[in-house]
Amino acid sequence: MINEKIWHEKLHRHVGQYFSIDKILYQKKNKYHDIIIFQNSIMGRIMAIDGVVQTTEKDEFIYHEMLTHVPIFYHGLIKNVLIVGGGDGGILREICRHKSIENITMVEIDLNIIDLCKQFFPKHNNNAYKDPRLKIVIDNGLNFVQKTKEKFDLIISDSTDPIGCGKDLFLSDFYFHCKNCLVKNGIFVGQNGVFFLQKNDINQSYKNLKKNFHDVSFYQATIPSYYGGTMMFSWGTDNIDFRQINIKNLEKRIKDKKLTFNYYNSNIHISSFYLPQYIINTLDKS
């Protein structure tokens, strides 16, 4: 919702956040999304889809580093990656930093998102769209995983919230077909919203993931532009040993890559899986 120079998020009914608008850079509704991109003096450029903040220049690095590097470093031998969604290019940018990865497939329902983010958020992708390892498929994510014969070591679901086009990417059917697209010991991760305000959605994701993977959990990060508390990331795999790696071995994997980060490190990685008791209690009841 826009009120003069103020934009109000409309994800939650009784609470929310607002941003002042310095300048509207783009605003249009297409058959998939209602998109606005505007400038804010604190957060830089902000993109909202269907009334919900998707990304900002200021804090995008937290989300993209955590959703990408946690599964890659836990696994240790990722070669083939599928990104479902992710048209802003941030996940792609982080994946492309790993030179050992051989193939990257991105499935994005709306080509317009990719084009807009290339124009208005160039630092998100940092020229990663030119990487020769990348293949872009314009399709619905659920439809793609239902039909593809390809196999992946890692699937990252960088979706919108479970409303509109994004709803399909939280269904048990989606997780089932993602599982079928993974090689043995493959990993699925995805964004799952803010637990404090989206508890029911996260509980349902937990149930759906448990139907398809032996090791299911969530890990977390605090991202200022995602209102209401810590952002939850879902984790699913059949290999129960990945999360048993000790911190020294994890640190060695990270050091060997010779990468630098703005948020992610080995301590953040390990501690992100230690959830507050109220979340544990709620998941146990589900």
UniProtKB/Swiss-Prot annotation:
GO terms classed as biological process: spermidine biosynthetic process
EC identifiers of the protein: 2.5.1.16
CC annotations in GO: cytosol
SUPFAM superfamilies to which the protein is assigned, alphabetical: S-adenosyl-L-methionine-dependent methyltransferases
Keyword tags: Cytoplasm, Polyamine biosynthesis, Spermidine biosynthesis, Transferase
Enzyme class: transferase
Residues annotated to bind spermidine: 64, 88, 158-161
Subcellular location per the Swiss-Prot or TrEMBL entry: Cytoplasm
Highest taxon in the source lineage: Bacteria
InterPro entries: PABS, PABS_CS, SAM-dependent_MTases_sf, Spermi_synthase, Spermidine_synt_N, Spermidine_synt_N_sf
Active site: residue positions: 158 (proton acceptor)
Subunit details: Homodimer or homotetramer.
Summary of the function given for this chain in its UniProt record: Catalyzes the irreversible transfer of a propylamine group from the amino donor S-adenosylmethioninamine (decarboxy-AdoMet) to putrescine (1,4-diaminobutane) to yield spermidine.
Protein name as it appears in the record: Polyamine aminopropyltransferase
Source species: Buchnera aphidicola subsp. Schizaphis graminum (strain Sg)
